[in-house]
Amino acid sequence: MPVVLSVALSVAIVPVIASATAKRDIDEIRKKGATAVKLALVISTFAAVMMFAFSDKIIAVLYPRLNRAETETAVRLLRIISFTVPMGALREIYASMIMAIDKTKKIIVNNSFSVALKIAVTAICLSYFNVYGAGYGMIAFSAVGVILNARDFYILSGKNLKLVKNVSTIAAINVIMFLLAWAFDIYIKNPILSLATGFVVASFAYVVAAAFSGVFDGDELSGVPFSRAYYKLSQKLRFWES
């Protein structure tokens, strides 16, 4: 679900990239590509952080009848899978952007290699890590897919150094969100109450932190739901730019 949501919002930018490709506007491709990547990361990374921090509470709510050993297995597997959320979202959005540039063959090659690696890693890890091997196979598939697709996209569009700074900012904010969510997970024992309060507080803090840090510039999110509210908040928090 987090991957679907992040890709659904980010992929709305892909037609603009296709239009820029037809005009051979490399700057526009690079700019809109950065927006799509940041949007996918902002949503998927936060979702992954919440999954990891509240993994024990999520399992307790969804599967209250599991015994202790089963619960520990499910929690660990959920934590492993949480790493695939941002990587899966990025893999899909980079693939969509490459196809918008009309380089579909590159995606076929990259996906074929990623699937082959996933099968190999899963087969090896299952013999050593049991059920967790499937999770490690998913991580390998997503990670290699991101690396290959991102490499091809930036070969086609050129590097974007500002995006590196923005991604670093998003990562730093999510570290803080993890610590905040982890505190709720530790100190509130009731699973439902911990999840509800922790998620609401962390979500609010996350939006404020993203707006304050200026992850998105100007009209970068034009057409995205709630973009006007986000920019109004960002302008108030970044008052020194007014």
Where are these regions (language model features)?
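Membrane-interface junctions at transmembrane-helix termini in multi-pass inner-membrane proteins
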Residues: 82-113, 124, 128
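Membrane-proximal transmembrane or re-entrant/amphipathic helices at the cytosolic face
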Residues: 182-242
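Transmembrane helix-bundle signature of multi-pass secondary active exporters and lipid flippases
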Residues: 1-7, 11, 47, 84-88
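Interfacial segments at transmembrane-helix termini and the short loops linking adjacent helices
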Residues: 52-85
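Alpha-helical transmembrane segments
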Residues: 94-102, 150-165, 216
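Helix-loop junctions and terminal segments of transmembrane helices
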Residues: 6-37, 95-97
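Short alpha-helical transmembrane segments in multi-pass integral membrane proteins
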Residues: 32, 37-53, 65-69, 128, ...
